[in-house]
Amino acid sequence: MVDAITVLTAICITVLMLLMVISGTAMIVKELNPNDIFTMQSLKFNRTVTIFKYIGLFIYIPGTIILYATYVKSLLMKN
């Protein structure tokens, strides 16, 4: 059976991956031409994209390191 720590680790990795994908998408949308329809839709949309852009900037490197370390750990546990 799977213990609670493994389940919690899997959930945390999944949440981190989803947050990284959303933040990465926000960075891509934010880097588009300011005259595009994406950034001109509404102030609320632009503010949300900006917040996710900052989250993406702050978690990109630590998130990548954590995901890689967890992957290596899972490979070592199989042996």
Swiss-Prot record:
Main location: virion
Transmembrane segments: 9-29, 48-68
Intravirion side of membrane: 2-8, 69-79
Tagged with keyword Transmembrane helix: yes
Induction statement: Expressed in the intermediate phase of the viral replicative cycle.
Keywords: Late protein, Membrane, Transmembrane, Transmembrane helix, Viral envelope protein, Virion
Family (UniProt): Belongs to the orthopoxvirus OPG081 family.
Job description of the protein: Envelope protein.
The name this protein goes by in its record: Protein OPG081
Organism this protein belongs to: Monkeypox virus
Taxonomic path: Viruses, Varidnaviria, Bamfordvirae, Nucleocytoviricota, Pokkesviricetes
